[in-house]
Amino acid sequence: MADTRSRRLFTSESVTEGHPDKICDQISDSILDEILKEDPNARVACETSVTTGLVLVAGEITTSTYVDIPKVVRDTIRNIGYTRAKYGFDSETCAVLTSIDEQSPDIAQGVNQALEAREGQMTDAEIEAIGAGDQGLMFGYANNETPELMPLPISLSHKLARRLSEARKGEILPYLRPDGKTQVTVEYDENDQSVRIDTIVISTQHHPEVTLEQIESDLKQHVIRSVVPEELIDEETKYFINPTGRFVIGGPQGDAGLTGRKIIVDTYGGYARHGGGAFSGKDPTKVDRSGAYAARYVAKNIVAAGLADKCEVQLAYAIGVAKPVSISIDTFGTGQVSEARLVELVREHFDLRPAGIIKMLDLRRPIYKQTAAYGHFGRTDVELPWEQTDKAEILRQQA
């Protein structure tokens, strides 16, 4: 038997679009997208909560356009698949309550005209009059473990969750219902290379009449085998499929949901650090969102350039101040150049002021709903600007 003393296990999870917290993320980002379609400069901080038969949308929105929020809510729930009362939640009959205010003028004055501009250090044209919408710290991460430069556990967890929804919506497994969760445990060797999958956990909501045996058989055939590389599975890989034995009551009927409660699912599955800020429902002046996207963009380009096998980038901001108060890079001993040199390259080639990020990544567009389920990073099914590696070549040349 192989020596496993220096091997380690790492686990990440994902959830399907029908999970209560993810319903809320998708509603918040659908509202954001509808507003940005007509008013790209809108300020949006939209929070959603769901429970049995009820959706509450609250927050601060300053915009020149009108959006029929209840219609957006119902359309989103319908597209997810909650279309019948027997699912415990129905897009046509659920109550939708809204409580929307405008952005605080105290915050707006800091965002509208950044501190450096007020002090005469920079022109409004340079900063486009946008300071950070809040203080805070954000992390971005990339490694060369997968083609999309993401850690393998979260990558596979997302793919399993997305495949669950495809099997349901495509009626490959018509007894599936929208709520579900996935989890993958990967074994790493002493060189930190992934060698095998130790455990796969899938819990999926289902029709009450289907047997656990059928669910187990079908998910192995139609979900796991279609997603997980065969060479990573061996006879010792463990499967836990609906381990409680029954998952009929789910969605908002089973658990209340809230925007921003799946921040680790949204990012790197716990493989990298997290600054604590959620993404969904926030316009790009909120650095919780745009700063995290920029940090991923930086980290991915550093790894794509071959300057490190792993790279974690931390950005930090002060409210109303455009320039980040700190930029920190950790390559975990895998860097081809010093971390200090990488910070210099980042300052030179990436504009990490909020207005600079918005311009660099073209963020004033309705592109956010598609990020609200199955992860904001490492996506190969949708085009996201922070996933581009267009800076890799110049970083490689100048390192």
UniProtKB/Swiss-Prot annotation:
One of its GO terms (molecular function) is ATP binding. CDD domains: S-AdoMet_synt. This is S-adenosylmethionine synthase. Its main location: cytoplasm. GO terms for cellular component: cytoplasm. L-methionine binds at E60, Q103, D255, K286. Its EC number is 2.5.1.6. Mg(2+) binds at D21. Catalyzes the formation of S-adenosylmethionine (AdoMet) from methionine and ATP. The overall synthetic reaction is composed of two sequential steps, AdoMet formation and the subsequent tripolyphosphate hydrolysis which occurs prior to release of AdoMet from the enzyme. PROSITE patterns: ADOMET_SYNTHASE_1 (PS00376), ADOMET_SYNTHASE_2 (PS00377). Binds 2 divalent ions per subunit.
